[in-house]
């Protein structure tokens, strides 16, 4: 039996928004979601226990997500080769390999969930889901953060359209709604975006 939904959170703000999303549901739908707390960049303290007691979530998991720098073999793939084809070839290998290396640390089988909500899909979880070909919903990392700092465009400056096309085909991964397996991107205000994703 498929589980309803799961939220992957990296910050307290992400958890706050996940709670609001759950509280906004009809009462009979609440309490059926899972919550994943990534410890890659945040110390959540006793939040796991508190979330379990809240009744808002059916299950709460720790996620020992690893940054790409944890995997020494990936460092070489981040180096500039001096050519666009060489860089794109390394980028394809990097995206695939980071997803693969992350797998032992992933605490749940995401294929068991109907809806997957990922805050900050630029973190390794985005690469993992892309590598596994698992569809998900991206959620804006912070209130209007894309309005003020569009990481997808900044991180992929130089030949952005080519890279976005490659991401749409699944050859590389780009965050914030550009990846093949990202179904949509939830933002606070689409009117505020310079580059709305269509």
Regions found by a protein language model. Give the residues of each.
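Active-site and donor-binding regions of nucleotide-sugar-utilizing enzymes
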Residues: 6-173, 177
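Long, charge-rich alpha-helical interaction segments
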Residues: 186-198
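Generic start-of-chain signal for non-secretory N-termini
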Residues: 1-3
């Amino acid at each position: 039996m498929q589980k309803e939904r799961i939220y992957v959170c990296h910050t307290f703000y992400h958890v706050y928004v996940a709670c609001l999303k759950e509280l906004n549901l009809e009462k009979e739908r609440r309490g059926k979601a899972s919550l994943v707390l990534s410890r890659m960049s945040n110390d959540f303290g006793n939040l796991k226990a508190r979330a379990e007691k809240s009744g808002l979530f059916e299950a709460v998991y720790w996620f020992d997500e690893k940054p790409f720098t944890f995997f020494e073999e990936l460092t070489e793939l981040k180096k500039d080769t001096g050519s666009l084809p060489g860089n794109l070839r390394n980028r394809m290998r990097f995206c695939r390999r980071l997803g693969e290396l992350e797998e032992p640390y992933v605490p749940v089988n995401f294929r068991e969930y109907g809806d997957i909500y990922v805050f900050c899909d630029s973190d390794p979880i985005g690469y993992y889901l892309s590598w596994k070909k698992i569809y998900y919903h991206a959620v804006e990392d912070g209130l209007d953060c894309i309005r003020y700092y569009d990481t997808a465009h900044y991180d992929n400056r130089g030949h952005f359209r080519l890279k976005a096309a490659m991401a749409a085909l699944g050859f590389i991964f780009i965050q914030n709604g550009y990846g093949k397996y990202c179904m949509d991107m939830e933002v606070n205000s689409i009117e505020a975006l310079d580059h709305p994703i269509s």
